[in-house]
Amino acid sequence: SKYDEVKHVDLLKEGKYPTFFEDDLCVVVCPSFGGRLPYTCAERLRHLRANNAIVILVCVYGNRHYEDTLLEMKDICDVCGFTCIGAICAIAQHSIIHEFGENRPDAQDKKELLAFMEQIYLKGDREIEFVPGEYPYKPLKNFPLHPYADKHCTKCGVCVEECPVGAISLEDMKDCDSDICISCMRCIAICPSKARKNNPALVLSTKALIKK
């Protein structure tokens, strides 16, 4: 197969953006935040140059709804020069309210994802024109959840290094810059001391908002 060589490109941090070519097959994976692409994902996707490379889109959402995310991904990838041959919405545990999509993806999810990929493979390189979503896209919503560090923080700096938008500084690792933070919860997920958390009252209000 001409796709035997696999290369992982991490766009979590700004940096060098790859250029793709017609013989490449790309799988672009993005999260859905409140039914939209996080603005940082949209900005970084726009830097890609595809030159008619084939793309399969994967939108990961926390078992609420992905709404306009997949359409937004496709619109951006079309402008970048990708040829979209497939699109998948995959459920994962919600990054804020863990009881939504808890333990997902599970074995059945993985089985279905493999089946979807096989369908796309058998379909061949025929471009798809339609994916779910509406334009204009729904407004972007900012959740007022900005993680902070408790007394267990060891100041190891992992959160500073791994924050995709640079919202945590070495000078003050306890808090984050609420003007920059996108509430992705990466710092909570990767903290080796489990020292980062959200305001519990705000988590409860966010849960109620998501349930509506």
Name each model-derived stretch.
Residues 127-164:
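A mid-sequence, solvent-exposed acidic-amphipathic segment
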Residues 149, 154, 158-182, 186-203:
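Iron-sulfur cluster-binding cysteine motifs and their immediate structural context
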Residues 1-12, 17-30, 34-142, 201-206:
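FMN-binding flavodoxin-like domain, especially the glycine-rich phosphate-binding loop
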Residues 209-211:
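Active-site-proximal loop/hinge segments that shape catalytic or ion-binding/gating pockets
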